[in-house]
Amino acid sequence: MPFAKRIVEPQWLCRQRRPAPGPAVDASGGSAEPPPPLQPPGRRDLDEVEAPGPEEPARAVPAPSGLPPPPPPLPAPADQTQPPHGEASVAGEESTAGIPEAAPAAGEASSAAAAAAVLLMLDLCAVSNAALARVLRQLSDVARHACSLFQELESDIQLTHRRVWALQGKLGGVQRVLSTLDPKQEAVPVSNLDIESKLSVYYRAPWHQQRNIFLPATRPPCVEELHRHARQSLQALRREHRSRSDRREQRAAAPLSIAAPPLPAYPPAHSQRRREFKDRHFLTFNSTRSPSPTECCHMTPWSRKSHPPEDEDTDVMLGQRPKNPIHNIPSTLDKQTNWSKALPLPTPEEKMKQDAQVISSCIIPINVTGVGFDREASIRCSLVHSQSVLQRRRKLRRRKTISGIPRRVQQEIDSDESPVARERNVIVHTNPDPSNTVNRISGTRDSECQTEDILIAAPSRRRIRAQRGQSIAASLSHSAGNISALADKGDTMFTPAVSSRTRSRSLPREGNRGGDAEPKVGAKPSAYEEGESFVGDHERTPNDFSEAPSSPSAQDHQPTLGLACSQHLHSPQHKLSERGRSRLSRMAADSGSCDISSNSDTFGSPIHCISTAGVLLSSHMDQKDDHQSSSGNWSGSSSTCPSQTSETIPPAASPPLTGSSHCDSELSLNTAPHANEDASVFVTEQYNDHLDKVRGHRANSFTSTVADLLDDPNNSNTSDSEWNYLHHHHDASCRQDFSPERPKADSLGCPSFTSMATYDSFLEKSPSDKADTSSHFSVDTEGYYTSMHFDCGLKGNKSYVCHYAALGPENGQGVGASPGLPDCAWQDYLDHKRQGRPSISFRKPKAKPTPPKRSSSLRKSDGNADISEKKEPKISSGQHLPHSSREMKLPLDFANTPSRMENANLPTKQEPSWINQSEQGIKEPQLDASDIPPFKDEVAESTHYADLWLLNDLKTNDPYRSLSNSSTATGTTVIECIKSPESSESQTSQSESRATTPSLPSVDNEFKLASPEKLAGLASPSSGYSSQSETPTSSFPTAFFSGPLSPGGSKRKPKVPERKSSLQQPSLKDGTISLSKDLELPIIPPTHLDLSALHNVLNKPFHHRHPLHVFTHNKQNTVGETLRSNPPPSLAITPTILKSVNLRSINKSEEVKQKEENNTDLPYLEESTLTTAALSPSKIRPHTANKSVSRQYSTEDTILSFLDSSAVEMGPDKLHLEKNSTFDVKNRCDPETITSAGSSLLDSNVTKDQVRTETEPIPENTPTKNCAFPTEGFQRVSAARPNDLDGKIIQYGPGPDETLEQVQKAPSAGLEEVAQPESVDVITSQSDSPTRATDVSNQFKHQFVMSRHHDKVPGTISYESEITSVNSFPEKCSKQENIASGISAKSASDNSKAEETQGNVDEASLKESSPSDDSIISPLSEDSQAEAEGVFVSPNKPRTTEDLFAVIHRSKRKVLGRKDSGDMSVRSKSRAPLSSSSSSASSITSPSSNVTTPNSQRSPGLIYRNAKKSNTSNEEFKLLLLKKGSRSDSSYRMSATEILKSPILPKPPGELTAESPQSTDDAHQGSQGAEALSPLSPCSPRVNAEGFSSKSFATSASARVGRSRAPPAASSSRYSVRCRLYNTPMQAISEGETENSDGSPHDDRSSQSST
């Protein structure tokens, strides 16, 4: 356009100019224009044009063209070309006319002549020509430039093309090369590859760093030189070893020889040896690896694994793998097949070489073992842990070749002749570890696990147990290396030969892997020192000191390290043994994670990788013995003891256990040999474990393993006590380690760790330790089965429970293990610190003094909120809102964890987070996938394996870890683990909660009070709740076996996972949900209690969760809250209750499940299940629920509303359901201004129904129906109480059909009113109601149909009579008292009849807590035997009357003590509701575990507690019920102490509700019997289970909160109340949650009242 402008203007000028000259031009003549003038004028014009340019240039110059003048002329010529031809004059005139104007501007005002005009004409032409020429030139230039540009582009394109072709050629070459490559060559690793890949996350840092350094392709020159030197020295060493192998001592002497050479050239020798090993393998596999650097880097171990079988390394590899649980696991699975191969360690050197190369793969074998264990996998794992372990423990105890260590290997091991020598072998390997320690510290958790060749001494470790006096030092030294490596960051010191294997074990350590690098350095000196010291056995004391100084790298840990070391250093021998214990304990803790892994091995889950840390240690130490240990140990509850016990047992005995306990055996071996050394190192590790989370995890499982091993080998009480104490202490640390996994970043409060270290070492020698030993001992006779884990659990009361709690958050420690909790020991210290140094409930002693201690410890933990991880583990085993790493991991680990959450917390589990365990997820995702979340489910990490190592599961998914330790040698622990994997978050939380709740009724509540989300009691109950642990063991073994599924909660009564879920839920929904979490726990336990739950464990926990979700979807918030809230109440479930429930559960749950499947309505199934369960467990529940109810009422008026919405849900069983129902009615009535008469009416229904049921156990159809109707009536009344409470109750009276009609009506009315979870589920748990709120009509329909099934007429009569009785509250109260006494009497009288009637059995189970040992044993044994399920067989064995009685006493003491003490009162408040619901949940869940898996899992713990309570005192229970009844107002909540002290309180609605639970219990009792008899029984169990599930949901604070939130007004109000209640200790969780979660307006009223 500028050109256009200029062009136009020049033309203008021409035109304007010409008009003036026109006359002259015409006069002169058109032809007169002379060319000369043209040029000058042309120039002039150009000048003019340019001159005017100032005006034009403004327009024209803007054109970027460098020729402003030419463009104007160009148009001018065009115009002027024409003028000259014909229009010259015109143009000239115009131009002339215009030019004068333009000329003045240009300064040419004088040009007006004709000549000027002509000149202008010529000028225009010239200008046009010039302009045209210039334009053409410009165009040509532009074209030239364009051509050059195009040429450049073409050249660039050509270059690019050439490059592309070159690249294509290269790619083609690469493709050709790749096509030539065989993927399997790199994946060749003999099934270790995929496991390794799974675990490589854990050990990749250590291994890959090392591999990169050591692999031929990636080796730096200096490293290559070192490699060459190492190869040379290794060859020399091998020659030495071979020459020695010719002699008997080749196994033991060779390691010593290796130790001597490596020590001199510490880093070099170690590195060289490792490189030699690797180079040897690399040379062998170089061709395979060299093709791809990755292959060299990653595949070296894998190739080695697959390759070594060709040469002697095959044996070594196998030996290493057993040490590193790869082959050990197969050996375990194959009984001795792999052991024969692997255990005959070809040469310690070769073993070390292969370990160095196959550390990852070695660790992987743990998971492989899980696969190999498949022959017995799911059931075998559970069975082995619960039954097989329980049964085999005696065998395995003698079985030195527990996992199939061939006798020749044993002999070779023995050839060393002295356990010390063999252990020294291991220690020698350990000594080289320091060099590797740096590597491991730098990049590996693996390194901490792979500690040293101490594994070699595994068999001698068994010997050590036998040779307690002398062997302690030797065994300490022996196990010190392994444990040091496992537990201590210093373990890396053992890397050279031992480190490889140890590392392979180390790798499985979840927690360690993630956060072990730093502590390793600090601990490494300790490990090395200890290893060195252990080499000298007594030199170890100085080494310990040097250890403490040498672990400055772990500065945070050092204070503790110094303390622990100093304390242990006091006496070399004692210190060695203690340190060995401590180390063993810590190893047990570390192995705990490993053990979970071990279980994973058994289960073939990634957890085994973690387990390998401990397992590898064990297997490495003593292939055969280690596996025995591992087998028994990681069986946690059952297998650990047997493996330890069966050390002397022939290999034949070992295979079954091996399959189940293979990893545990490894862990045990690791633990025993390493534990001794680790006694000091372990203490040191406790400080270091802060980073050594994996080690801590391993310590967890390993603690139990170590405890068992040490217990078995160290039968003497003194050593055993010390050992057990340290072991448990470390186990607690380990558990804490899991929970702190997420706080691991916080460094877990080093000072606390230090204090804990001091405390731990102090406790190691403290009576508490010995008391733990008693617990240890209690099951020790049966094969360390219960003894070890009991110890773990008891000691873990503080430590295990805390540790479990730690797991919960991590999991998805979540499942994942909680790498954040690096040091189990450190956590233990924190735990001590937190729980109170004086009251150390590390292990509950046989004397049962620890429960109070446990409460104390939990309390302390709660008090020490500053140490969140420690607190977390205690509170919720990974359910802290802050770091539900386990829960979140879980997936656990898991939790974790997912996590293994972290690895599991979150995790979670977690879960799945152990999960996740995940690590929390570090724990392979079996649990968390989580959690497994790997080990910690990695929860989240989740949920590695439910069957194998419940302890591991708990570790993996903190929830179950807690249970595992709690139920130490019982199926309970196992069940918890199983449950954990499934619901890393929810179930893990439940398990945690249950474990905590039963363990620390007061402590847990207090903890909850301190940090509701943390579920303070979680850890404590699990570990410390000996009764809970023991009894669940009996009943859970079946569930555990049937459900080796990661959620082993079916077996475990205290579903720590559930609890974890609770914590998770609180984290998700409300800080106050911790109470809800507790409630949640009870629900899962019942499921696990159920054999059907056991059968459905794999499906059930998830199924349970699915129902939970279904309910949650229906009333998501409410149900979720209820579900999570319920488990803690369930925790009160006694092992006996669990067993009794389990017996029925198998049939009922399955039947109910069928019904549930038949009836698409989950609510209906739940209802029927609830009905059946409520009736069947009614006898147990009357006590459990009544106690729980009274406790709930007395504990918290605030919780009353919470319980009202959540109590029913909270009550896993029908009893609790009905009680909660009553609560709901009562509380709702109060909140809703419903008259006490109406509440009485409802209560009367339930009570009458219950009485009827109790009175007529056989006509249970009627009672069941009645029970269902009354409950429904209650709920419906609760739901519709404001409008039609009386009418509805009366309507119930007319008949089942009418009632059904009304109930169906109520659902619409009640659902709207109770749109929250509670109201709908009258029969079902109130937790069911959230689910049922949506499906109330169907549910009620189903329920009523069920009622009809039972007996329409009797139901009608009973309802009418109940309605009649409703008005007479006093009568009802007396009735209830009668019922309570009747239940008590019945429980006493029916103990022998436990199998006859569900109610009787339940009552008997409830009575288990009562003084009668037969009551305890009979219900469990009879139930399990009646079920004829293998699972129960093992529980019976592990559960001695004595043990059960002790557990019950412990539980009673806790319950009573809690009630008595102020702190306990607070906890009681929170716990009582939990207990009540737990009790109910347990009862109901047994029949309906399938449907109610989550609830069942939660309920067992509470039921256990409730059973204890009821057993403790029927009178007390009656008082509590009465008080609770009087305490009907949600607003008025008395503490448990208040209830106990002032039995009679305002009894209008509260009393009624309190009574009604008893009635419900009675009805449940009758119902149980009826279930078996009548077609309704299938439905009834389903109803119970479903109802239980619903109840669970309602009880779950989280789930319930969610559902409550769904309803606008009521839910909002309820939620607020819920939050307040949750914030309240545990009070609101139970009752408030039930109320709130209940969809009914009563919930709101209750909440308001409680508020």
UniProtKB/Swiss-Prot annotation:
Q: Using the record for this protein, list the coiled-coil segments as residue ranges, or answer none.
A: none
Q: Locations of Low complexity compositional bias?
A: 629-648, 980-993, 1408-1423, 1465-1496, 1588-1618
Query: Annotated region WAVE homology domain (WHD): where?
Result: 1-262
**Recorded superkingdom:** Eukaryota
Keywords attached to this entry: Cataract, Cell junction, Cell membrane, Cell projection, Cytoplasm, Membrane, Phosphoprotein, Tight junction
User: How would you summarize where this protein is expressed among tissues?
Assistant: Detected at low levels in all tissues analyzed. Detected in fetal and adult brain, lens, retina, retinal pigment epithelium, placenta, lymphocytes and fibroblasts. Levels in retinal pigment epithelium, placenta, lymphocytes, and fibroblasts are very low. Expressed also in kidney, lung and thymus.
Which positions make up the signal peptide?
none
- Composition bias of kind Basic and acidic residues appears in 507-521, 859-874, 1640-1651
Q: Which Gene3D superfamilies match?
A: 1.20.5.340
Linked disorder reads: Nance-Horan syndrome: Rare X-linked disorder characterized by congenital cataracts, dental anomalies, dysmorphic features, and, in some cases, intellectual disability. Distinctive dental anomalies are seen in affected males, including supernumerary incisors and crown shaped permanent teeth. Characteristic facial features are anteverted pinnae, long face, and prominent nasal bridge and nose. Carrier females display milder variable symptoms of disease with lens opacities often involving the posterior Y sutures, and on occasion dental anomalies and the characteristic facial features described.
What protein am I looking at? Actin remodeling regulator NHS
Tell me which residues bear Phosphoserine: S415, S533, S739, S1176, S1329, S1499
The UniProt entry's GO biological process terms, in alphabetical order, are: cell differentiation; lens development in camera-type eye
What is the role of this chain? Answer: May function in cell morphology by maintaining the integrity of the circumferential actin ring and controlling lamellipod formation. Involved in the regulation eye, tooth, brain and craniofacial development.
Gene Ontology terms, cellular component aspect? apical plasma membrane; bicellular tight junction; cell junction; focal adhesion; Golgi apparatus; lamellipodium; nuclear body
Q: Where is the composition biased (Pro residues)?
A: 65-76
